[in-house]
Amino acid sequence: MLGACGMQRYHQEALKKNRVMLARELVLKELMEHMIEKDIITIEMVEMIQAKSGSFSQNVEFLNLLPKRGPNAFSAFCEALQETKQQHLAEMILKTESSLRHGIATLEQRYGSNLPLPLSESCNSKRPRLIVEHSLDSGDGPPIPPVKHCTPEFYRDHQHLAYKLISEPRGLALILSNIHFSSEKDLEYRSGGDVDCASLELLFKHLGYQVTVFHDQSAEEMESALERFSKLPDHQDVDSCIVALLSHGVEGGVYGTDGKLLQLQEAFRLFDNANCPNLQNKPKMFFIQACRGDETDRGVDQRDGKERSDSPGCEESDANKEENLKLRLPTRSDMICGYACLKGTAAMRNTKRGSWYIEALTTVFAEDSRDTHVADMLVKVNRQIKQREGYAPGTEFHRCKEMSEYCSTLCRDLYLFPGYVPGK
């Protein structure tokens, strides 16, 4: 994850010292298009900013986001200001930045480079990073449990409401795992990421999938691998597909080893009904192990009292229901995507056991795929993640939390029917 520490401290300070003026006078509409073009923000981030009411609130949201967008964000912002005829704002912050840079250089000459920094700005590689380098809980991970097979009786009882999933192999699976990153980028080695990759590869094979793995790909190489995979003619002969992306990330994207972003919407687009006809009406599963922000979930104390387990019902409206079957398909359907964490938050990883999310995912799928459909298994994964807590005594990350989630356009129950062979 490229967090707030990606931006130089004097760049952050220059923005902070001019924050009120920027919040009042910044004109964002065209500027944000330039920032997208420069690969600093994503379309999803623009939508999040535009959801705020009023230009001042939108500017504040943008200024909150900007320091988290990496080492190139400040210069890109200044260029975008000039390109959108807001030179007075660019000159203002550049003048402040020059003064701050000169002041810091003078202090470092006098006292050395070990100046104390605010916590959010400290990017020293020796400082334990929340999601990447610091082991947040104790102990080695257990071996992956064997996948339990479904029975012929279970298949017969549930096949009618489920996706057809009996091909051999069940489908093709692609894993893109980035662990090592370009040295000039502020993206650290993903210690424990190799455990995630090995765990998923073994799980998918045990579930009956033909697995392809690519390690340490640039953003362009990742997109190329996804495109080639989506166009494989073998998809026509199988019943499903799996894609897993394991890397650093931000909301709406995951990082290649070159520090550039692969936009998730572009990845999903490659597998939609328009671009991947061989997978039309077939379930497509995506699993994203990457941060979606840099906020640490500190958790809250649970109030005393019985835990609520039942949800109240709701009335269903029959208004505007379509009576006739359509011959056309929506552009995107039959997909389910599991995310390691919520929007804006960081994902946790243990340096020995791998990530919390992938560990929970492999455990639940191995144990429960014999008689539980994928959406319900992801609810069980959520439950395991909810109960987990960081273990890092003496650090700010002790007892931190994480919450996974999934989104779905599935139209039937997605049972994986592991081990079931028709006619046997």
From Swiss-Prot:
The active site is at H248, C291. Keywords: Apoptosis, Hydrolase, Protease, Thiol protease, Zymogen. Its EC number is 3.4.22.55. It catalyses: Strict requirement for an Asp residue at P1, with 316-Asp being essential for proteolytic activity and has a preferred cleavage sequence of Val-Asp-Val-Ala-Asp-|-. One of its GO terms (molecular function) is cysteine-type endopeptidase activity. Involved in the activation cascade of caspases responsible for apoptosis execution. Might function by either activating some proteins required for cell death or inactivating proteins necessary for cell survival. PANTHER family: CASPASE 2, CASPASE RECRUITMENT DOMAIN-CONTAINING PROTEIN 18. Belongs to the peptidase C14A family. This is Caspase-2. It comes from Gallus gallus (Chicken). The gene is CASP2.
